Amino acid sequence: MDFKEIDDSVKSRVMAMVDRVAGIKENDLYYFNQPVSELRGGARVLVRGREMGMYASYSYLGLVGHERINEAAIKAVEKYGTGTHGVRFLAGSLDLHEELENTIAEFKKTEAALTYSSGYVTNLTVVSSLVGRHDYVFSDKLNHASIVDGCLMSGAKFVRFRHNDIDNLAHRLAQVPKDAAKLVVADAVFSMDGDIIDLPRIVELCKEFNAWLMIDEAHSIGVLGDTGKGIEEHFGMENVVDIKMGTLSKTIPSVGGYIASSEEVITYLRHVSRAYIFSAALPPAQAAAANEAFRVILDEPWRTEKLRANTEQFIGGLKQRGFDTLLTETAIVPIVCGEDDMAYSLTRASQEKDIFVLPVVSPAVPEGMARLRATVTAAHEQDEIEYAMNVVEEAGKKLGII
């Protein structure tokens, strides 16, 4: 097939994106897919020969490069090699996987846990395995794309409720037949805005309407709670979430995703969820690294405490300088710029002063709400955060954002 001779909707979609990317590159405003050549302790990186302060990383507790975690990965490679060469359901399960799942279950205070090859595929396969065409799935309007895709793939009746609007969720639930199976899914920390789901009220509603509750903790592990155990600890609640989802690629410096739940739910997913049955198992190094990372979180509580202090400094300082950071109270800090070109321009000005931030533009966020989605970690020091804020402030004033 000659691409140049094709004239259909597929080519139209392809060329629309190609043209959009080309336009951004022509204006020297393309900052996506930048290769990082060195990770220097989490707070600093080497990009195209320049050392920069990293404010776009999900390594919230600064565990990238942690000696204990690296050592666990190295030992796993020495013992098992670099891959399992099989799916978990058949010949790909190692004792390392079982150990990791036991660690996760203990950390999340559930009976069992199950790991997958990525966080995206975890949401995709779990939601679509739990509900089907005669069921209902309720999703916060700002949930992660993986949740949305899982809802769509499930074939269930897909109902979206206004962002963190529990009254609107109650209204939606009340419209559904009482005997229908219902699953409510929400992020613990919303990845674009940094705000936190109203867990106490959503739990109350799920009990009232006999609905299952699934919470995505991708951005809350290590971030929320006195010891970093997540959304339930943050609100002083225990075992109120039926299905606890998380990733192994943000606070945990590895790759993969997990579900922590009851023994029955995990047994069901182990034998039904297609991404578990038909995907390769986590490589030994990644499983061992993730397992050790959970232990480090518990052994080094100062990291969670420092992250909390750094977050307060960063959000407070940006607000004092006149920036709109929406309703965030976590390490994800949106710096609202307005139009897409303003976000690109603020990114360029910041990176020119060695502050590595990245833009988020439409359609990932609504038009007119383009932003820098900055993140702060436990690896940052106070003076580094102050410098970053000063750089963004200077650029923001020149661009008329503040």
Q: Whereabouts are the PLM-identified features?
A:
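N-terminal "arm"/small-domain region of PLP-dependent enzymes with the aminotransferase-like
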Residues: 16-80, 211
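PLP-dependent enzyme catalytic core of the Aspartate aminotransferase-like
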Residues: 71, 75, 79, 102, ...
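Conserved N-terminal alpha-helix of the aminotransferase class I/II PLP-enzyme fold
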Residues: 71, 75-118
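Conserved PLP-anchoring active-site segment centered on the Schiff-base-forming lysine
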Residues: 126-145
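Active-site phosphate-binding strand-loop segment of PLP-dependent enzymes
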Residues: 159, 163-215
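Active-site C-terminal subdomain of aminotransferase-like
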Residues: 209-212, 219, 224-329, 342
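Conserved PLP-binding catalytic core of the aspartate aminotransferase-like
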Residues: 304-314, 319-354, 364, 369, ...
